[in-house]
A protein has these predicted regions:
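Short beta-strand/loop segments at the ligand-binding rim of alpha/beta enzyme cores
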Residues: 5, 53-60, 96-102, 142-149
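Catalytic beta/alpha-barrel core
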Residues: 33-39, 58-65, 78-85, 101-106, ...
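Active-site-adjacent beta->alpha loops and helix N-cap segments on the catalytic face
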Residues: 37-51, 68, 83-96, 112, ...
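Conserved N-terminal beta1-alpha1 strand-loop-helix module at the mouth
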Residues: 1-76
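Catalytic cores of alpha/beta
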Residues: 67-75, 110-116, 155-166
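Single conserved hydrophobic/aromatic residue that forms the stacking wall/gate
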Residues: 173-183
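Glycine-rich beta-strand-to-loop/alpha-helix junction loops that act as flexible
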Residues: 61-62, 149-154, 170-173
């Protein structure tokens, strides 16, 4: 399966809307979907997505902070763990379950620690604070073909600048609209 270099983050989406939103995303080429664990009923949402889209998308959790959460996500059948930080224990537990590990990093030291711990790709977070030029400098010391994603402050107006500096992809938030919060 070839993946679009965009990862949809379904932050704050309720279980009764998660499949409808995923339908739209998948119909438009998204094939990596993350549900942050600080969303409402995240494991139930992940389970619904896994049940419907296992053959069409890589489904998993974000904001994974500890090994217990890795196991909880693994139990849903998901295959992706995204973390906001570089936690060696989380990375190693993720790889123990043969899942894809994308930990967050901010510095060259964190990036190399994540890769040495077994990470499959890196999430540069928050990207708006790092900036594409700093990312480019850090990427020069990473092993060739390291997949790097930018998250936090990435949008249609600045995505091209990141692409020009060879970012592998971006993570984009899908959040409920202000109207949805009142329903």
């Amino acid at each position: 399966m070839k993946y679009l270099p965009l990862i949809a983050i379904l932050r704050g989406i309720t279980t009764n809307k998660v499949l409808d939103i995923a339908d739209i995303l998948i119909d438009n080429g998204f094939n990596i979907i993350e549900v942050p664990l600080n969303s409402p009923n995240p494991l139930k949402s992940i389970q619904l997505l896994v049940n419907k889209y296992t053959d069409k998308a890589l489904i998993g959790a974000g904001t994974v902070l500890n090994v217990k959460e890795v196991k909880d996500v693994f139990d849903t059948g998901a295959k992706l763990i995204v973390s906001p930080n570089t936690n060696e224990d989380v990375i190693k537990e993720t790889k123990k379950f043969k899942m894809v590990s994308i930990p967050g990093c901010f510095t060259a030291s964190e990036a190399l620690l994540a890769l040495n711990s077994g990470a499959d790709a890196l999430k540069f977070f928050p990207a708006s604070s790092i900036g594409p030029k700093t990312f480019n400098a850090i990427s020069q010391i990473l092993p060739k073909n390291t997949k790097c994603f930018a998250v936090g402050g990435i949008n249609s107006s600045n995505m091209k600048e990141w692409i020009d500096f060879n970012i592998s992809g971006c993570l984009l938030y899908t959040s409920p609209s202000p109207r949805d919060k009142h329903r």
